[in-house]
Amino acid sequence: MIVGIGVDLVSVRRMQQLLERFGNRFTARAFSEVEIRDSLQYKNAHAVARHFAKRFAAKEAYVKAVGLGFGRGIEMRGVSVFNDALGKPRIAVSGDVGHNIELSLSDDGEYAIAFVVLHV
């Protein structure tokens, strides 16, 4: 049974501006160690921004699906987006969430999008 859905769209250009302006202060607040480590595989700033934009969109889509916001029991670093062994995007959440999470990520040009479905 579906218990929540969420979608979010993030500007890759805006993410790149945030990364240029705030650097490690921003990534340390918003992203998990796994997400930061995974970004190191990219060689240029635009690819890094695309990586973080998709993960940021996934976090926002997740909290929308749950029906809460960040700071209301969910912290940004407590939601970690990674790819499994087959390359499928996954979300790991700190604590027992009591539901299954399906995640789809995409990017095209200057935008990244995430769609989350929660089900039991």
From Swiss-Prot:
Q: Which SUPFAM superfamilies match?
A: 4'-phosphopantetheinyl transferase
GO BP terms: fatty acid biosynthetic process
Which compartments does it reside in? Cytoplasm
Q: What is its main location?
A: cytoplasm
Which co-factor is required? Mg(2+)
List the EC numbers from the record: 2.7.8.7
The answer to whether UniProt assigns keyword Transferase to this entry is: yes
Its UniProt entry gives the catalysed reaction(s) as: apo-[ACP] + CoA = holo-[ACP] + adenosine 3',5'-bisphosphate + H(+)
The GO terms this record gives for MF are: holo-[acyl-carrier-protein] synthase activity; magnesium ion binding
Swiss-Prot/TrEMBL keywords? Cytoplasm, Fatty acid biosynthesis, Fatty acid metabolism, Lipid biosynthesis, Lipid metabolism, Magnesium, Metal-binding, Transferase
- Could you say which residues bind Mg(2+) here? 8, 60
**One GO CC annotation, please?**
cytoplasm
Enzyme class, UniProt record, top EC level: transferase
Member of which family? Belongs to the P-Pant transferase superfamily. AcpS family.
Q: Which HAMAP family does the record cross-reference, listed alphabetically?
A: AcpS
What is this protein's function? Answer: Transfers the 4'-phosphopantetheine moiety from coenzyme A to a Ser of acyl-carrier-protein.
User: What is the name attached to this protein's record?
Assistant: Holo-[acyl-carrier-protein] synthase
Recall the taxonomic lineage recorded for the source organism.
Bacteria, Pseudomonadati, Pseudomonadota, Alphaproteobacteria, Rickettsiales
Name the encoding gene, please. Answer: acpS
